[in-house]
Design a protein with these regions (language model features):
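N-terminal Rossmann NAD(P)H-binding glycine-rich loop of SDR-like oxidoreductase domains
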Residues: 4-29
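Conserved glycine-rich Rossmann-like NAD(P)H-binding loop of the short-chain dehydrogenase/reductase
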Residues: 28-38
Length: 201
């Protein structure tokens, strides 16, 4: 029996590689849709031979999105940037890219699309990052109303770029300042159950 295919845009990123491993363990065939397939070569051993494939794709290019998505059972879009560079602008990645993925998913009749946005996504925000994340949500909802949109806060786990920075700082300082904050959700990758969602603050 053929494995169901799940395409993961941004599969070589921090969240992506944990998700790819989890999906492969569940028995799915995984297409890790990435701009640099060589940088995603480490994903292949996460499954049986041929189960995990690094697939060349750019969310800004509609044709490459369609090629990556065709035949998929489900699609997950994790693509996002924290700061723009060259042709990778917030608008092109968070809005145009998100719209391209959702448009193709709807056109091909794929029933399941999960889109990763961000906590604080808002058109009223002073941050262009948050503004474009909100614009991307609208584009996804308009193109594919059945899509599931997630708004995670801090995502942490092995090799993350958040808590591990603080861990490295403890090597140079006995104390670290801790700033109070409201309660907010967090997502932890790894552990006994793979992914957990909780609240902290």
């Amino acid at each position: 029996m053929a494995r169901k295919i799940i395409t993961v845009f941004g599969g070589s990123g921090f969240i992506g590689r944990h998700l790819v491993r989890r999906l492969a363990a569940k028995g799915y065939a995984v297409r890790a849709a990435v701009r640099d397939v060589e940088a995603a070569a480490h994903l292949k051993p996460m499954g049986d031979a041929g189960q995990v494939v690094a697939w060349p794709a750019d969310v800004k290019n509609l044709a490459s999105v369609r090629a990556a998505v065709e035949g998929s059972y489900a699609v997950i879009n994790l693509v996002g940037i924290l700061s723009p560079w060259s042709k990778q602008t917030f608008d092109r990645v968070h809005v145009d890219g998100a719209k391209n993925v959702a448009t193709v998913v709807a056109a091909l009749g794929i029933k399941r699309l999960i889109h990763m946005s961000a906590l604080g996504a808002s058109l009223e925000s002073e941050s262009r990052y948050a503004q474009t994340k909100a614009m991307g949500e609208t584009a996804v909802s308009d193109a594919c109303p059945s899509a599931t949109i997630m708004r995670p806060s801090v995502v942490f786990g092995p090799e993350d770029r958040f808590f591990n920075i603080f861990a490295s700082l403890t090597r140079f300082s006995v104390t670290l300042p801790v700033i109070g904050a409201p309660i907010m959700p967090k997502i932890e990758l790894g552990g006994e159950h793979g992914i957990s969602i909780d609240f902290f603050g």
